[in-house]
Amino acid sequence: MTKSELVAQLASRFPQLVLKDADFAVKTMLDAMSDALSKGHRIEIRGFGSFGLNRRPARVGRNPKSGEKVQVPEKHVPHFKPGKELRERVDGRAGEPLKNDEPEDGQ
């Protein structure tokens, strides 16, 4: 699901929300989450999961073009850990085939 699909789904689920307001709400929420993570905070949404940062230590890498060794600095990367309810909900679909986003044979 893309951000625009999420906005459209919110607008259709809640008729009092116009598309513009749903878009504003989604953008505002994502901006707030991005700001919190960039400040090193952890985000916990009960029943859904938590977002945090993982530290990747500095290491020696290799330039694939020249083969030369390069120092790769330490960095922090976003990490998502699904909550128990989300894991159980997804696991309930364990026997079902994965849904393809593209229709097969023009269906």
Swiss-Prot record:
GO terms for molecular function: DNA binding; structural constituent of chromatin. GO terms for biological process: DNA recombination; regulation of DNA-templated transcription; regulation of translation. Gene3D superfamilies: IHF-like DNA-binding proteins. Residues 65-101 have a biased composition (Basic and acidic residues). Residues 54-107 are annotated as: Disordered. InterPro entries: Hist_DNA-bd, IHF-like_DNA-bd_dom_sf, IHF_beta. Pfam families: Bac_DNA_binding. SMART domains: BHL. Keywords: DNA recombination, DNA-binding, Transcription, Transcription regulation, Translation regulation. Belongs to the bacterial histone-like protein family. This protein is one of the two subunits of integration host factor, a specific DNA-binding protein that functions in genetic recombination as well as in transcriptional and translational control. Heterodimer of an alpha and a beta chain. This is Integration host factor subunit beta. It comes from Burkholderia thailandensis (strain ATCC 700388 / DSM 13276 / CCUG 48851 / CIP 106301 / E264). The gene is ihfB.
